[in-house]
Amino acid sequence: MKIKMRGQDVKVFYGSKEALHGITLDIPEHQVTALIGPSGCGKSTFLRCFNRMNDTIEGAKITGLITLDGENIYESRIDVVELRARVGMVFQKPSPFPKSIFENVAYGPRIHGLVKSRAELHDVVEKSLRQAGLFEEVKDRLHEAGTSLSGGQQQRLCIARAIAVSPEVILMDEPCSALDPIATARIEELIDALRKDYTIVIVTHSMQQAARVSQYTAMFHLGHLVEVGETEVMFTSPKEQRTQDYITGRFG
């Protein structure tokens, strides 16, 4: 199986505090990899390394190696804007731009110069909304504000916005934590459909969600990677006692 992204001996420091302690983890292509663990364990910090979002935090320092298709994404010649188009992100709370539904999706392809005509832009917007399972619900109201949508629809709009720039990887940081069970189920179905075209890494507090949507799971605890493996194996016969204790609810 092809490895799309790889972290090798990744350490993250916030000032003098070491938040991640030498994480080595492979992200397989066209699979969903779930990062689980109790609050404050480092899973979101590690996720943000994959598209250099930690660069925006004052005092943050990253050591080790992170590669995308074998290329070090922290090399000085890397264009971070281009990297974040290749490695998109969906955040915990739905965060549509204060623009129309259409413009939320059109914004990325337009600023990245991915379309040559208005017709092509319309095609990209429609395709992205369809992939996000949202087009039929909004096709007659594309001019309305993205913020007018329900929470679940807003999160699917954010997913459409991410995929409109043709990323290779989509990072999701607890994308369902602010959603009700019905909206969560829609997002989970969408994640499963999207992995045909994208590599997905999802941070989740929900063990049930990790079991439903992922093929691989990595367990974090106190800034360390405890274990990683196929999700089914991890949830039925984990190697580490800390993993067993976490997935059975003994701590977390």
Swiss-Prot record:
GO molecular function: ATP binding; ATP hydrolysis activity; ATPase-coupled phosphate ion transmembrane transporter activity
Entry-linked SUPFAM superfamilies: P-loop containing nucleoside triphosphate hydrolases (SSF52540)
Enzyme Commission number(s) of this protein: 7.3.2.1
Binding site for ATP: G37, P38, S39, G40, C41, G42, K43, S44
Entry's localization field: Cell inner membrane
GO CC terms of this entry: plasma membrane
Top-rank EC class of the record's enzyme: translocase
InterPro entries on file: AAA+_ATPase, ABC_transporter-like_ATP-bd, ABC_transporter-like_CS, P-loop_NTPase, PstB-like
A Gene Ontology biological process term: phosphate ion transmembrane transport
Main location: membrane
Catalyses which reaction(s): phosphate(out) + ATP + H2O = ADP + 2 phosphate(in) + H(+)
Purpose: Part of the ABC transporter complex PstSACB involved in phosphate import. Responsible for energy coupling to the transport system.
Subunit comment: The complex is composed of two ATP-binding proteins (PstB), two transmembrane proteins (PstC and PstA) and a solute-binding protein (PstS).
Family: Belongs to the ABC transporter superfamily. Phosphate importer (TC 3.A.1.7) family.
Official protein name in the record: Phosphate import ATP-binding protein PstB
Organism field: Bartonella henselae (strain ATCC 49882 / DSM 28221 / CCUG 30454 / Houston 1)
Gene: pstB
